[in-house]
């Protein structure tokens, strides 16, 4: 059964407060998703505001286009299919110059998590895919069936911060000798057996699935590649806002902002000395928001 592209924008009020969209401003949503943030920013930037929306997932772009069309704002937006690692090229091709605000929402959408066919979920069986862009690159099945035990252990430990990484990698390699992995439920079961059951609130496969998703989509490498481009594209006084969902992303963002705000010729001023997190009310309404952290900086110049 098809799942409608539903994704509740996280920290929406806080994002609008921090970006402070103004009429005739130019804005970039580098992870446009279902268009929740994009629509709110574009509405606040009228009259005359424009928005460039980028996403690796064609389904996300279609959902955003429909949302902006319904709001009568599609003519004020340009939507591009691609990776935010190519931010500068995509912006130039779309005819945008300096931006007054740039947003990254690094979370996987509810649509992607809740659509078994996308292969992100360990709670609903589907093909073991995990690609944010289904037209590009290796799938998670390719990785677990081809990589060495050591390579798998390194990925699961580094990207999932999973202490049972070696045990999980060994179990994966043993299983695939007789039956290559094809389905998410199959991998989740093997991982759960290797870990030895649930520990606390999270499913035993949570960290392994996170690690594979990061590896499949080269998420951390692409984040490191895009952040300097984002600063280059900001107008003086423009703001960069980044929402992260796990410690690996947040560490990269935090260290990058600190580096850009220091030295002889700093390019940024940090606005959020500590990250902004969701209110208890937002988490109650949208439990997937609970780990979100928003960091913001302003372009000097």
Curated annotation (Swiss-Prot):
UniProt EC number: 2.1.1.199
The reaction(s) this protein catalyses: cytidine(1402) in 16S rRNA + S-adenosyl-L-methionine = N(4)-methylcytidine(1402) in 16S rRNA + S-adenosyl-L-homocysteine + H(+)
Keyword S-adenosyl-L-methionine carried by entry: yes
MF terms (GO), sorted A to Z: rRNA (cytosine-N4-)-methyltransferase activity
Location within or outside the cell: Cytoplasm
BP GO terms, sorted: rRNA base methylation
Entry-linked InterPro entries: RsmH, SAM-dep_MeTrfase_MraW_recog, SAM-dependent_MTases_sf
Highest taxon, organism lineage: Bacteria
Pfam families according to UniProt: Methyltransf_5 (PF01795)
Keywords: Cytoplasm, Methyltransferase, rRNA processing, S-adenosyl-L-methionine, Transferase
GO terms for cellular component: cytoplasm
Role description: Specifically methylates the N4 position of cytidine in position 1402 (C1402) of 16S rRNA.
Family: Belongs to the methyltransferase superfamily. RsmH family.
Name of the protein this chain belongs to: Ribosomal RNA small subunit methyltransferase H
Organism for this UniProt entry: Chloroflexus aurantiacus (strain ATCC 29366 / DSM 635 / J-10-fl)
């Amino acid at each position: 059964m098809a799942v409608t592209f539903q994704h509740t924008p996280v920290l929406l009020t806080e994002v609008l407060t921090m970006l402070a969209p103004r009429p005739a401003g130019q804005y970039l949503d580098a992870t446009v998703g279902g268009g929740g943030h994009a629509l709110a920013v574009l509405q606040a930037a009228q009259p005359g505001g424009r928005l460039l929306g980028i996403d690796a997932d064609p389904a996300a772009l279609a959902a955003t286009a429909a949302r902006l069309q319904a709001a009568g704002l599609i003519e004020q937006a340009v939507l591009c299919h691609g990776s935010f690692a190519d931010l500068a090229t995509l912006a130039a091709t779309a005819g945008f110059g300096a931006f007054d605000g740039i947003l990254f929402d690094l979370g996987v959408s509810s649509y992607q998590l809740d659509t078994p066919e996308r292969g992100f979920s360990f709670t609903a069986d589907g093909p073991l895919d995990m690609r944010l862009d289904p037209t590009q690159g290796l799938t998670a099945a390719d990785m677990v069936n081809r990589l060495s035990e050591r390579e798998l252990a390194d990925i699961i430990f580094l990207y999932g911060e999973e202490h049972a990484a070696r045990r999980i990698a060994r179990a994966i390699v043993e299983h695939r000798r007789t039956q290559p992995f094809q389905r998410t439920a199959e991998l989740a079961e093997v991982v759960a057996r290797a870990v030895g059951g649930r520990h606390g609130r999270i499913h035993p496969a949570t960290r392994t699935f996170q690690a594979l998703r990061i590896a499949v989509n080269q998420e951390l490498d692409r984040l490191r590649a895009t952040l300097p481009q984002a600063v280059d594209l900001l107008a003086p006084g423009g703001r960069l806002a980044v929402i992260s969902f796990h410690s690996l992303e947040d560490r990269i963002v935090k260290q990058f902002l600190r580096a850009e705000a220091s030295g002889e010729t700093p390019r940024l001023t940090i606005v959020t000395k500590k990250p902004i997190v969701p209110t208890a009310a937002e988490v109650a309404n949208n439990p997937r928001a609970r780990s979100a952290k928003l960091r913001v900086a302003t372009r000097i110049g």
